[in-house]
UniProtKB/Swiss-Prot annotation:
Family classification: Belongs to the bacterial ribosomal protein bL33 family.
Protein's name according to its UniProt entry: Large ribosomal subunit protein bL33
Entry GO CC: cytosolic large ribosomal subunit
Protein's organism: Cereibacter sphaeroides (strain ATCC 17023 / DSM 158 / JCM 6121 / CCUG 31486 / LMG 2827 / NBRC 12203 / NCIMB 8253 / ATH 2.4.1.)
Organism lineage string: Bacteria, Pseudomonadati, Pseudomonadota, Alphaproteobacteria, Rhodobacterales
Coiled-coil boundaries: none
Keywords, in A-Z order: Ribonucleoprotein, Ribosomal protein
Length: 55
């Protein structure tokens, strides 16, 4: 079986609230760490989320 191109990643909030999103990314085309601005429901505003490993 072939190796899958998409991998699951965890987007951790930089606000320090402990909130995270789980999403997928193409590991072949996006080789650098993903940084996205998304809504943090704990802080109730948009903050940056940085990519981390799923434990």
């Amino acid at each position: 079986m072939a190796k899958p191109t998409t991998i699951k990643i965890r987007l951790n909030s930089t606000a320090g609230t402990g909130h995270f999103y789980v999403t997928k990314k193409n590991a072949r085309t996006m080789t650098d760490k993903m940084v996205v601005r998304k809504y943090d429901p704990v802080k109730r505003e948009h903050v940056e989320y940085k990519e981390g490993k799923i434990k």
